[in-house]
């Protein structure tokens, strides 16, 4: 993954500075009397960047910079509306200029689930965090409808599976698979595809893990805050659970993740979601997806 990021093209510095200047002018046009500072907040594995706006009265906002033609903020806006209407806590859109790729958003803070977990919270707090995360996921899944988001179809799944031979085997390891090895891999991929595509389908965040879940301050907050959902699709119901419990950034004992999975399955059945009636079948789907 990090090797892939390292190959992403870097925009020339003068273009980045020009974009930042345009953002500053845009903010001033909306609130000429409001003094503020603008500072980088984060970036992801794309041309998209984020800035935190701190106003002189102490309030903060976040600006998404999604420069056309490299980025399109409209998919993000569509998913924001879908997930927000479902009751999930997503950033509020305060202003938008889709032609230039600027969005002014509410600020969900700096505390990701990852940073909260790295502080080694008590077991009860960890259990609450993951309970909140699965509750939010169930809200999103209950709102699912076909034909609204792109389908997580065979072509997309296969394209992601092919990252393994292309990026890991060939680029990272510097190896070339023999014809016999490739045939074995292709057979394995077909088994995986059959299992994944046979699952019940729901809205899928696609990056539902500890770096994209925000821990919000204050009592009664609708945790977690959910970000980075622009690539959401309609696909296998176990996908986001695998992202959450088999997180690339946080490692858990299998006994722990199995307990969380059972709790999710019980809540999902009560919510009327199309999970398998038998937990063993559901767990098998989850493992095939993993």
Language-model segments: residues:
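ATP-binding glycine-rich phosphate-binding loop
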Residues: 36-51
């Amino acid at each position: 993954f990090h090797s892939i990021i390292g190959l992403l093209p870097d925009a020339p510095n003068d273009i980045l500075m020009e974009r930042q200047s345009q953002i500053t002018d845009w903010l001033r046009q909306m609130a000429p009397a409001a003094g503020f500072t603008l500072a980088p907040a984060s970036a992801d594995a794309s041309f998209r960047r984020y800035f935190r706006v701190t106003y002189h009265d102490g309030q903060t906002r976040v600006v998404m910079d999604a420069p056309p033609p490299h980025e399109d903020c409209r998919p993000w806006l569509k998913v924001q509306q879908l997930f927000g209407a479902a009751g999930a806590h997503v950033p509020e859109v305060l202003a938008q200029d889709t032609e230039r790729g600027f969005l002014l958003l509410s600020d969900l803070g700096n505390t990701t689930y990852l940073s909260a977990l790295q502080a080694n919270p008590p077991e009860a707090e960890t259990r609450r965090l993951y309970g909140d995360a699965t509750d939010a996921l169930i809200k999103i899944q209950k709102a699912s409808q076909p034909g609204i988001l792109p389908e997580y179809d065979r072509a997309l799944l296969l394209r992601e599976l092919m990252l393994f031979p292309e990026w890991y085997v060939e680029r990272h390891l510097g190896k070339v698979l023999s014809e016999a090895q490739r045939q074995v891999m292709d057979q394995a991929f077909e088994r995986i595809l059959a299992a994944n595509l046979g699952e019940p389908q729901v809205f899928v965040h696609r990056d539902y893990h500890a770096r994209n879940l925000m821990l919000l301050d204050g009592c009664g907050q609708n945790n977690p805050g959910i970000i980075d959902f622009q690539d959401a699709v309609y696909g296998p119901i176990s996908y986001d659970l695998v992202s959450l419990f088999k997180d690339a950034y946080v490692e858990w004992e299998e006994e722990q993740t199995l307990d969380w999975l059972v709790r999710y399955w019980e809540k999902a059945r009560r919510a009327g979601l199309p999970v398998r009636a038998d937990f063993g079948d559901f767990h098998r789907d989850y493992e095939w997806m993993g």
